[in-house]
């Protein structure tokens, strides 16, 4: 199935130096992938030339005159950057010219712009950011990772539905398990929002595992972990910090003496395999679930390999009909939008 992905070629810390090599590698590996590079035409053409590439049937340029800065406010991006590479890429999804959009740009601006242009699916009050984390059993999808600091029980139910349908489509699991992140596994634990969300999830048609604790995330206890954006973002950043610390400790210990250096040399194949399993680039690409279009956010500091994974994630979501599955499940659950809680669009 042919898929067309619009790429914000100017977004992120490194812009076209990362996005264009990633796009070229992505279309080489996926014969059914088409890419639209959105941004300043002269800059994109120069980067293509540097990579000994040109436009063609599967790769074309869509000119945009403006760029959203990484520190620009969502309000400024919406009001003052109507011809930004970010917004034009999202507009291509709205018009149907592209089936998905990928950007490494400013998260707040991307969420606000995507919400403004694409709107939310019927039954979804507010989009959520879903990301992938490695586990002992494979990987887990976690949401929300920062879009909604405060949530109602109904919002958490919506997140669970979206996350479950994403996993069902992309991982080809018929009934993925859903866990509600809490301070204990017992039903009586947690604040009122989490308790009420648990009741809604138990009454839903989802495969609800129950409450899970932080240590369950990396055990792979469930396929989906649901929480509000405040908790999710703290958990994510804590995990990133821990991974960096472990990596630094390993390097320090192996450099301690000639004997430890020799041990490091002997252990190199194992260490490489270990590093690959935990390589954050393999899990790059957070999905903005709940919109009337596929939007994937790459880490701003991503290199070309990491950005390529984000492109692949967007293509897989489009190819496997994630939006249709979410819409169908929302209708089954008879959900209606609830009052919005504070999120990135209200910042």
From Swiss-Prot:
It is an enzyme of class 2 (transferase). Keywords: Cytoplasm, Lipid biosynthesis, Lipid metabolism, Phospholipid biosynthesis, Phospholipid metabolism, Transferase. The keyword Transmembrane helix does not apply. GO terms for biological process: fatty acid biosynthetic process; phospholipid biosynthetic process. It catalyses: a fatty acyl-[ACP] + phosphate = an acyl phosphate + holo-[ACP]. GO terms for molecular function: phosphate:acyl-[acyl carrier protein] acyltransferase activity. Signal peptide: none annotated. Pathway: Lipid metabolism; phospholipid metabolism. GO terms for cellular component: cytoplasm. Its EC number is 2.3.1.274. It is found in: Cytoplasm. It holds the Pfam family FA_synthesis. Catalyzes the reversible formation of acyl-phosphate (acyl-PO(4)) from acyl-[acyl-carrier-protein] (acyl-ACP). This enzyme utilizes acyl-ACP as fatty acyl donor, but not acyl-CoA. Homodimer. Probably interacts with PlsY. Belongs to the PlsX family. HAMAP family: PlsX. NCBIfam families: plsX. PANTHER family: FATTY ACID/PHOSPHOLIPID SYNTHESIS PROTEIN PLSX (PTHR30100), PHOSPHATE ACYLTRANSFERASE (PTHR30100:SF1). This is Phosphate acyltransferase. It comes from Methylobacillus flagellatus (strain ATCC 51484 / DSM 6875 / VKM B-1610 / KT). The gene is plsX.
């Amino acid at each position: 199935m042919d898929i067309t992905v619009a790429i914000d070629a100017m977004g992120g810390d490194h812009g076209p130096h990362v996005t264009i090599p990633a796009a070229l590698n992505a279309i080489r590996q996926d014969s059914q992938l088409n890419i639209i590079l959105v941004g300043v035409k002269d800059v994109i053409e120069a980067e293509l030339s540097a990579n000994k590439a040109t436009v063609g049937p599967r790769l074309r340029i869509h000119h945009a005159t403006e760029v959203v800065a990484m520190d620009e406010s969502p309000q400024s991006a919406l009001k003052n950057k109507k011809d930004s590479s970010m917004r034009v890429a999202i507009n291509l999804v709205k018009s149907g010219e592209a089936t998905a959009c990928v950007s490494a740009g400013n998260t707040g601006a991307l969420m606000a712009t995507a919400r403004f242009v694409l709107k939310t699916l019927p039954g979804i009050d507010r989009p959520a950011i879903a990301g992938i984390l490695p586990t002992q059993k494979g990987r887990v999808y976690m949401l929300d990772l920062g879009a909604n600091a405060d949530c109602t029980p109904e919002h958490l139910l919506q997140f669970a539905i979206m996350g479950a349908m994403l996993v069902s489509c992309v991982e080809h699991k018929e009934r993925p398990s859903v866990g509600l992140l809490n301070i204990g596994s017992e039903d009586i634990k947690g604040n009122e929002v989490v308790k009420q969300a648990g009741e809604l999830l138990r009454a839903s048609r989802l495969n609800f595992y129950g409450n899970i604790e932080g240590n369950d995330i990396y055990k792979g206890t469930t396929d989906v972990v649901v929480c509000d954006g405040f908790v999710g973002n703290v958990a994510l950043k804590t995990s990133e910090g821990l991974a960096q610390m472990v990596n630094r400790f390993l390097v320090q210990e192996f450099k301690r003496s000639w004997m430890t250096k020799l041990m490091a040399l002997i252990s190199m194949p194992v260490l490489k395999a270990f590093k690959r399993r935990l390589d954050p680039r393999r899990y790059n690409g957070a999905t903005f679930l709940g919109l009337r279009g596929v939007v994937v956010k790459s880490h701003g500091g991503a290199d070309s390999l990491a950005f390529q994974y984000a492109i692949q994630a967007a293509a897989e979501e489009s190819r496997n009909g994630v939006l249709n599955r979410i819409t169908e499940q929302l209708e089954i659950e008879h959900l209606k939008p609830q009052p919005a809680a504070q999120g990135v669009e209200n910042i």
